[in-house]
């Protein structure tokens, strides 16, 4: 709900007293004119303080702004939803004034959200409120606050979008001007949020290739904390554009007040947290302006990406649940449609794609209950067949030597085996060893007067997506596949290179600093065009693993590849961190081979299955190398996953015991909104003799309901002591269940890994 909050004057003591004075005939020493002047003056004073407050509300939160026309936009409050009484008095709490969107130039010695250079060289801004407008969309309410410079015809609209079916508020700006010549935007953050000083901790993600989504938690200390990306294409390998602030001490999963923030952008970003010796941490989020100064033409509108904010008094997991619900409903393609169980060919055959081998893999995944087969890299190239990563990108024609029956033959095989078919592409990239590059060397990103810097395979280059011809070429890759083979159900969209050359043959020499921004504008145009024509297509975002895990692209993509590292133990850590901001339905989590192809660690199949079942289950393996016993275990697991799939992919997450706490155990669970079903995961993460592991208490259940417990993926000779037994939600949340440290299996099957998946269902 969005309110221009108007006060009921008679409810305030000062007005009640004045009204009583006016009514009293005994106060003959005060003239009516004098009494009315006092009343009118008080009205003006109070109106200027309060009547222009704007309250932006979701079901459980409030964001309050002071927005007097002709005055400065101020931040007043963000947190738990306020009552009517609290709204009346929110300006009287003694809280220091803070700007809601600080600009550079006048009385601004600190960090700013917006800094420009006017056409006449003036570097200052002084913004005042012109008007406040509100509007409604389905399940959302929007307030737009228009700001204008006091001297120059320079405008900023600050937007607040409050979702009424999720506790998330999106903030963004639109910048425009009517000056005679271009204005240079040197800094253009999407949003600013002051956070009251206290024992505030920051949770954020970091990593690298094959080690994405690692969790870091730290107290905010004086100084500047900067989290930024300059990759150009992939923005979530080394850091993430999402953070959480725990407001009352060291972060807790299921207790404490938490603000979550996610910048919805696919390109270079910068998050700044400025802490000085005053009352606030100052948080800025937006596009990374480094090497990206933007020349804004008259009447052109520059829109910044949305910053999504959420607040929860139920700890980190509560903030995650808010993000997940918002994502499934609004920020993820087909976010409420359960995902298929698939087999991807990559770790099974790598580039060694062939017709018979693909048919066999389809047959194998079908026999285990899978629903989709995805042919990965290696299927294309004519003059330069794709035998490794050094050639062929850009030449999106079938290699007839590998696939003599073509894609149509594969589709027939898929139909025969009763599975859907998907295919891999990397459309934003090319190899210099390709027919494409021979025809269009000017379509790649390249610095003038410099040799082209090449990436993967020694020959890979990035296409210039600022160029409309390149945009059309990329769209046509997908359009040709889908037009010629409409039975294709799934596309894996990869991107395996950073921008290593700063230069665009399409942009003018004066606008070379626009390159990063225009690349992602072009990328979004392509995605919009594809989704407009193929709204039902499932698309995975892969970028050397988890390089494109962000809410800038997910409205167009159904899921993402968490990491090229499929090692089950390391995946626990990566998927744990990723779950802070992204729901399980979007996290592709695959059962792979042992020894693992990245870490060479040998992990038992049961453990690999139990980890993969905590996300969107799939397989990344060569089935013909599996034993019949292993295939049977996978077949049973797939059948059981189909039962729990709606709970895992659409349920509420409760993280219970973090692997980062190094207690020897990681544990989490998903619970339906109705609290009638739940899936509980327990993984042993450290292995020592005579360990003493903590007992894990459950969360999110109804204390008054009774739950029957059943173990999934059981390999033990004997059932667990509590198998089939019933417990109250109150008991399970207060005490948990004692999980055995090891599996009771035959001696030759003993190993140092242990994991359990429990299915809880309400007994009615």
List PLM regions with ranges.
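Active-site neighborhood of glycoside hydrolase catalytic domains
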Residues: 404-406, 438-440, 444-606, 616, ...
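Polysaccharide-binding surfaces and accessory modules of carbohydrate-active proteins
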Residues: 53-65, 72-274, 290, 706-722, ...
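Carbohydrate-binding surface patches
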Residues: 60, 243-245, 253, 659-703
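Aromatic-lined carbohydrate-binding/catalytic grooves of carbohydrate-active enzymes
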Residues: 334-476, 485, 490
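Glycine-rich, aromatic-flanked loop segments that form ligand/cofactor-binding clefts
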Residues: 105-127, 253-267, 311-332, 370-377, ...
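Short Pro-Gly-centered flexible turn/kink motifs
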Residues: 124-128, 294-313, 753-761
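Conserved, mostly hydrophobic/aromatic
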Residues: 60, 173, 299, 414, ...
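C-terminal beta-sandwich/jelly-roll accessory domains of carbohydrate-active enzymes
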Residues: 686-764
């Amino acid at each position: 709900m969005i309110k221009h909050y108007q006060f009921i004057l008679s409810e305030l003591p000062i007005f009640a007293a004045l009204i009583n004075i006016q009514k009293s005939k005994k106060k003959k020493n005060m003239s009516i004119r004098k009494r009315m002047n006092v009343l009118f003056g008080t009205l003006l004073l109070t109106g200027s303080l309060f009547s222009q407050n704007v309250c932006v509300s979701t079901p459980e939160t409030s964001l309050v702004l002071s927005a007097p026309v002709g005055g400065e936009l101020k931040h007043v409050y963000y947190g738990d939803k306020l009552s009517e009484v609290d709204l009346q008095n929110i300006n009287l709490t003694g809280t220091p004034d803070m700007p809601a969107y600080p600009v550079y130039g006048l009385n601004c010695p600190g960090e700013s959200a917006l800094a420009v250079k006017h056409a006449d060289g003036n570097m200052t801004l002084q913004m005042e409120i012109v008007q406040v407008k509100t509007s409604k969309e389905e399940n959302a309410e929007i307030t737009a606050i228009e700001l204008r410079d006091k001297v120059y015809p320079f405008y900023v609209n600050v937007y607040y979008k409050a979702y009424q079916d999720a506790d998330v508020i999106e903030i963004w700006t639109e910048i425009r001007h009517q000056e005679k010549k271009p204005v240079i935007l040197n800094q253009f953050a999407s949003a600013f949020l002051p956070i009251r000083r206290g024992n505030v901790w920051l949770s954020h993600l970091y990593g690298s290739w094959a080690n994405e989504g690692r969790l870091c938690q730290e107290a905010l200390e004086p100084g500047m904390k900067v989290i930024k990306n300059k990759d150009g294409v992939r923005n979530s390998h080394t850091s993430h554009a999402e953070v959480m602030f725990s407001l009352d001490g060291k972060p807790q999963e299921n207790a404490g007040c938490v603000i979550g923030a996610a910048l919805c952008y696919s390109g270079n970003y910068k998050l700044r947290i400025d802490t000085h010796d005053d009352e606030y941490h100052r948080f800025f989020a937006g596009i990374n302006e480094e090497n990206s100064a933007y020349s804004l033409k008259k009447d052109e509108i520059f829109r910044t990406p949305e910053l999504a904010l959420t607040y929860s008094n139920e700890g980190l997991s509560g903030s995650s649940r808010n993000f997940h619900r918002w994502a499934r409903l609004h920020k993820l393609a087909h976010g409420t449609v359960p995902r298929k169980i698939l087999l991807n060919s990559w770790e099974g055959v790598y580039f060694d794609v062939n017709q018979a081998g693909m048919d066999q893999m389809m047959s194998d995944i079908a026999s285990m209950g899978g629903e989709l087969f995805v042919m990965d890299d290696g299927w294309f190239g004519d003059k330069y067949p794709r035998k490794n990563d050094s050639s062929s990108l850009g030449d999106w024609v079938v290699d007839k030597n590998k696939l003599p029956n073509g894609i149509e033959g594969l589709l027939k095989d898929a139909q025969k085996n009763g599975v859907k078919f998907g295919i891999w592409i990397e459309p934003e990239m090319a190899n210099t060893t390709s027919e494409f590059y021979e025809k269009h060397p000017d379509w790649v990103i390249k610095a003038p007067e410099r040799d082209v810097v090449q990436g993967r395979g020694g020959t890979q280059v990035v296409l210039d997506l600022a160029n409309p011809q390149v945009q059309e070429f990329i769209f046509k890759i997908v359009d040709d596949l889908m037009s010629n083979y409409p039975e294709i159900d799934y596309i894996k969209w990869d991107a395996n290179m950073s921008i290593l050359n700063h230069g665009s043959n399409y942009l003018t020499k004066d606008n070379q600093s626009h390159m990063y921004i225009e690349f992602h504008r072009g990328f979004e145009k392509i995605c919009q065009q594809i989704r407009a024509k193929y709204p039902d297509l499932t698309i995975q975002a892969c970028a050397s693993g988890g390089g494109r895990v962000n809410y800038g692209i997910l409205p167009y993509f159904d899921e993402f590849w968490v990491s090229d590292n499929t090692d089950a133990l390391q995946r626990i850590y990566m998927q744990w961190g990723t779950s802070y901001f992204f729901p399980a339905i979007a996290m592709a989590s695959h059962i792979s081979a042992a020894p693992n192809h990245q870490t060479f660690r040998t992990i038992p199949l049961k453990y690999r299955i139990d980890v993969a079942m905590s996300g969107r289950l799939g397989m990344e393996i060569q089935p013909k190398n599996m034993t019949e016993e292993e295939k049977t275990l996978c077949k049973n697991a797939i059948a059981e996953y189909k039962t729990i799939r709606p709970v895992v992919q659409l349920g509420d997450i409760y993280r219970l015991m973090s692997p980062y706490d190094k207690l020897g155990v990681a544990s989490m669970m998903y619970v339906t909104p109705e609290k009638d079903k739940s899936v509980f995961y327990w993984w042993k993460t450290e292995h020592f003799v005579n360990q003493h592991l903590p007992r894990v208490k459950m969360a999110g259940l109804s204390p008054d309901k009774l739950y029957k417990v059943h173990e999934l993926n059981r390999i033990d000779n004997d059932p667990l002591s509590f198998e089939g037994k019933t417990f109250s939600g109150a008991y399970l949340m207060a005490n948990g269940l004692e999980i055995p440290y090891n599996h009771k299996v035959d001696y030759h099957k003993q190993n140092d890994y242990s994991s359990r998946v429990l299915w809880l269902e309400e007994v009615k």
